[in-house]
Amino acid sequence: SGSCEVKTCWWSQPDFRVVGDYLKDKYDSASEMIVEKHRESRGWVETLTPKYTSFKAPTERDLIYYDSSPNFCNPNPATGSFGTRHRKCNITSHGIDGCELLCCGRGHDTRTEKRREKCHCIF
């Protein structure tokens, strides 16, 4: 007769919001890189170097990119993008639905509507 001890360890994922905020911070501080090809004894080798040397070199945990994002403001039939012209925007928002970002600096039109509706009020 012996004793048995059970020990269980596990990792749990943080809340989805925490992960999203972390990734957004990484995205916002991603470093643009230049792909340089050069020949070595083992063949062609590609190396990544920072495009802007005034910035700190990225670490293993930083996000990097070497292709700039397309301009989503203007229509692009090749990618199927319709652009953002004539889209509805939220004038009070500073997020992705806000007029400042969504209208790409082109300005925006404001439309005021008057509606007459039955409210089914009981007095």
Curated annotation (Swiss-Prot):
One CC-aspect GO term: extracellular space
Q: Which UniProt keywords apply?
A: Developmental protein, Disulfide bond, Extracellular matrix, Glycoprotein, Lipoprotein, Secreted, Wnt signaling pathway
Top-level lineage group: Eukaryota
Which sites does the entry annotate for glycosylation? Answer: N90
Any one Pfam family match given in the protein's UniProt record, by short name: wnt
The lineage, from the top, is: Eukaryota, Metazoa, Chordata, Craniata, Vertebrata
Briefly state the protein's biological role.
Answer: Ligand for members of the frizzled family of seven transmembrane receptors. Functions in the canonical Wnt signaling pathway that results in activation of transcription factors of the TCF/LEF family. Required for normal embryonic mesoderm development and formation of caudal somites. Required for normal morphogenesis of the developing neural tube.
Predominant location category: secreted
> Which one GO biological process term can you cite for this protein?
cell fate commitment
Which family is annotated?
A: Belongs to the Wnt family.
The record ties this protein, via Gene3D superfamilies, to: 3.30.2460.20
Give the protein name, as stated in the record: Protein Wnt-3a
